[in-house]
């Protein structure tokens, strides 16, 4: 009997030739924050291997959203290069997706050109740097930046967009009580903490229209005491469904809490094996799961 993995699947307006998706893992192949031939060749080779869709990773919706110096930044002048990339992917029979996001406080002035911004002000050990909390009157424009990036993705020929709302980046910083210490209508209760995500999704769905698939990557658990837990993340998932998202990419963890980044220590293999089993999949119905860790069975 043929595996269901290799049968077509439809979410929203998009049908894939099979159920395999190259997840939006950061490539670091965009010198000058623009697509390169290396990025094109990489995704073309993935598509040629028979995958259903390959996802270009972690494109910043604004310059302030950049975490890395070889990260894609969505702006009109890079559209011709992105069009070459999507044409190459489509020529191999695969769909082309792109992940859109903003790093929030996960940056440094030397990368993003300004003092990093986030849900709340403070000091981020990851960078390390001081962070300015976004004012409430700045949030509508930030949400519109997501919508503009979706329009640019459409112009570049992408079939789907994936909104990054996990891993401790900007949307996740608003959602998590660990990083959202606001006293206004965007902080406090979960309903308030979801308010910025709601604004983003409204702009995204408006720009996506009826012919572009929208995925959202979200945490099912932040992975540390004081972070989001399953009871709240299930409510976030339902809200995203109500917003019109066609699929959820279920994940977990906070980059800024990872000891290999903050303290440059050894990876916490024992605790990471908890995520190896993808325990959250039982909570999904129509889901796209994030690639799990493959670990050796013996110490090496």
Give the label of every model feature segment.
Residues 1-293:
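Flavin-dependent oxidoreductase catalytic cores
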């Amino acid at each position: 009997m043929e595996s269901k993995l290799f049968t077509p699947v439809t979410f929203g307006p998009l049908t894939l030739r099979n159920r395999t998706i190259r997840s939006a893992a950061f490539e670091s192949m965009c010198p000058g924050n623009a697509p390169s031939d290396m990025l094109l060749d990489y995704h073309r080779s993935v598509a040629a291997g028979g995958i259903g869709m390959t996802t270009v990773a972690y494109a910043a919706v604004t310059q302030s959203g950049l975490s890395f110096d070889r990260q894609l930044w969505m702006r009109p002048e890079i559209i011709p290069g992105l069009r070459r990339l999507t044409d190459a992917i489509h020529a191999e029979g695969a769909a082309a997706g792109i992940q859109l996001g903003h790093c929030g406080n996960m940056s440094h002035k030397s990368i993003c050109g300004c003092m990093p911004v986030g849900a709340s002000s403070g000091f981020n050990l990851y960078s390390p740097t001081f962070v300015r909390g976004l004012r409430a009157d700045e949030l509508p424009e930030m949400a519109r930046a997501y919508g503009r990036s979706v329009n640019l993705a459409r112009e570049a020929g992408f079939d789907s967009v994936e909104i990054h709302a996990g891993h401790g980046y900007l949307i996740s910083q608003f959602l998590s009580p660990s990083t959202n210490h606001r006293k206004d209508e965007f902080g406090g209760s979960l309903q308030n903490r979801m308010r910025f995500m709601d604004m983003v999704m409204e702009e995204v769905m408006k720009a996506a229209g009826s012919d572009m698939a929208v995925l959202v990557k979200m945490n099912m658990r932040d992975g540390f005491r004081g972070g989001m837990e399953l009871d709240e993340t299930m409510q976030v998932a339902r809200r995203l469904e109500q917003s019109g998202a066609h699929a959820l990419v279920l994940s977990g963890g906070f980059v800024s809490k990872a000891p290999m980044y903050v303290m440059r220590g050894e990876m916490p293999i024992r605790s990471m094996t908890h995520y190896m089993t993808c325990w959250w999949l039982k909570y999904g119905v129509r889901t796209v799961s994030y690639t799990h860790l493959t670990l050796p069975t013996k110490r090496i």
